[in-house]
Every structure is written in structure tokens, then in C-alpha cells.
Amino acid sequence: MHLVLAVTVRAQSAAHGVRETNAAVNVVEIFNAHVLPELQAPDLAARPIVKAGAIKFASTFRNQLPVETVRQLMPLLGNHLAAEQVVLHTYAAACIERFLGAKDAAGAPKFGRAELRPFLQPLVAALFALVEKAEQENEYVMKAIMRALSVAEGDVMPVTGEVLAKIKAALARVCANPRNPRFNHFLFESIAVLVRAVCGQDGGHVGAFEDALFPPFQTVLQMDVAEFTPYVFQAFARRG
């Protein structure tokens, strides 16, 4: 994988992926022949370093892989969120986030709301399962949640109750013991996105959000937790 990256990449940025490749190298053929079979293997514990390299390949060449390939890849990345190895489920979460943030040549989302819709519920459930069981807050997992909710927009309505309960639990933990500023940032951004998407579409949900979020928000304001206070007011502003 590293050799392929070295000879293929001509122009790349961390934020936007590979923009220019060696014309003599067919990225899609390499992906289908070598990367995809590794990610399709049922044993998540086998060859973790190779699997991590395969996920990195997919993430690096997200601009070159066609949407049809990404549709095939999404459930495989979701499966790897269940891997015990931190490096694997972290790479999988980061790869999901980067595909959801990728743009096509015209600047439109490459894998947008319609493409995400069939995978939204299982992906969000798998990501929150990691948030619940992780000993350390994983900022890449939380960023993937934020991105998925942002791309989904109104499609998040059917899973609002489940997502709100998970966010409430995570919020209670970080308010009691804030440790990872980037994780906290993406958590509060997820709250703001969810409030905008759900309450902006149906004001009948405002009460449920208030019941879930006001207790931890009140704790933040009463204890004057400076790093969280701006996020609390941002969430209030987006309530609708």
C-alpha cells in the first residue's frame, strides 16, 4: 500500500485528499483487486495492520473512487467500527467522515444525503457504540457522528430519540470530567446540528430536547465551565 501511495500521488492535502495522480496507475483497479477483498474479509482481528492500510488507501483516494464503489465500501467501514483494535475503528471512523465531507469537481457533496440514507442508522448506532465503550474520548468517532448528522439533515428524524439519548449520556460524562477538547467540540457541534435538523423541521420535538439537554446545560452554566458555555448558547440559538 505504501509503495502504491508513493508512486501514485502527485498532489495531495490532508483536508481534501489526492487531487492529482500518476496517470499510469489505475487507482480503482488496485482498490478492487487488493483493498476491497481485505475489507470484505470476515475476521476483523486478522491482519489489522494490513486492514488499517487498506482503509487509509480508501481515505487517501476518496476523490478517485466512484460513488458506486463508496456505496459498497460504507457498510464495510461500518463493520470495522466493531473492531477491537483502536487503530482500526479509528481509521474506519475517520474514513467515513472524510467520504461524507468529500466534494466532486463542481463542489457538490460526493456522497450526500441521498447516498447516506440507507446506511445512516447502522453507521450512527455503531459510532455511538464506540463512544459508549471507549475508555478515552475518540475525537475521530465524534467527528464522524457530527458529519453524518450534518449530511443526513431531516433524514435523522426516525432515529432522533436514539441519537438524543446517546448524546445526553455523552454530554453528562464530558461535563463531569472534560478531557478532550476536540471530542467536546464535535459533541457540541453534533448537538447544534441535531437541534437545527430536527427542531427546525418539527417544533414538536423542542420539549424532548429541552428535557434531555437542559439538566447538563444548567450544570455547565451554574459551574461556569468556560470551555462549554459558548456551545450551550449556540445550541439555544439553533433551537428554532
PLM features per residue range, with description:
Residues M1-G240:
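Karyopherin-beta/Importin-beta family HEAT-repeat alpha-solenoid scaffold
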